[in-house]
């Protein structure tokens, strides 16, 4: 379910479903904040839906950083599994100019910056939402490249290359988010 392409992943899911018996869905088991390979999780959207249902979740939601590019695959996998799902994304937001300015909220690394989610994006707005966040993904790439330079300054005899070593670990080619975790 983590094959290289969306088409392969969904085809593999169809095969797996022929022999899968899911446990009963538990009404209290809900997770509408599931990251996928489109930000930093090792699970493809297909694998995430499958794993959620195997754990007895009655519903699930995709939330990737700065990207909603995995949403269509998540929806297709959910349809095959017959599981209701939501789609959304997560981004960092500056709290400057608000009552939360200068305060630490839910981001342990930055004062005055909060992680915010957009939930239940209408399916016909996926492209619009993703296009809106394209500049944020570009800013993240610049920040990540600067971090790679700082990491390389600490290394002796080896060097990390963002394009060669980091981007292939992500779904950046499909407008997925590349996070600090890809650098680890």
Positions of the model-derived regions?
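Conserved oxyanion/phosphate-binding beta-strand-loop segments in alpha/beta enzyme cores
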Residues: 14-22, 29
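Low-complexity, highly charged intrinsically disordered N-terminal segments
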Residues: 1-14
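A metal-dependent hydrolase metal-coordination microenvironment
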Residues: 24-174, 178
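Short, intrinsically disordered, charge-balanced linker/junction segments flanking boundaries
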Residues: 181-184
């Amino acid at each position: 379910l983590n094959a290289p392409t969306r088409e392969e992943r969904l085809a593999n899911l169809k095969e797996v479903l022929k022999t899968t018996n899911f446990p009963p869905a538990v009404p209290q088991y809900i997770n509408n904040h599931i990251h996928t390979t489109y930000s930093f999780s090792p699970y493809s959207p297909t694998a995430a839906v499958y794993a959620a249902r195997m754990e007895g979740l009655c519903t699930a939601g995709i939330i990737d950083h700065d990207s909603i590019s995995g949403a269509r695959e998540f929806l297709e996998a959910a349809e095959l599994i017959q599981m209701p799902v939501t789609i959304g994304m997560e981004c960092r937001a500056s709290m400057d100019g608000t009552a939360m300015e200068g305060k630490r909220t839910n981001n342990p690394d930055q004062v005055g910056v909060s992680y915010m989610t957009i939930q239940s994006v209408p399916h016909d707005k996926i492209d619009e939402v993703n296009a809106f966040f394209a500049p944020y993904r570009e800013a993240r790439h610049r920040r990540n490249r600067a971090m790679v330079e700082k990491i390389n300054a600490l290394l002796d005899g080896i060097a990390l290359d963002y394009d060669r070593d980091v981007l292939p670990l992500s779904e950046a080619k499909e407008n997925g988010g590349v996070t600090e975790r890809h650098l680890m």
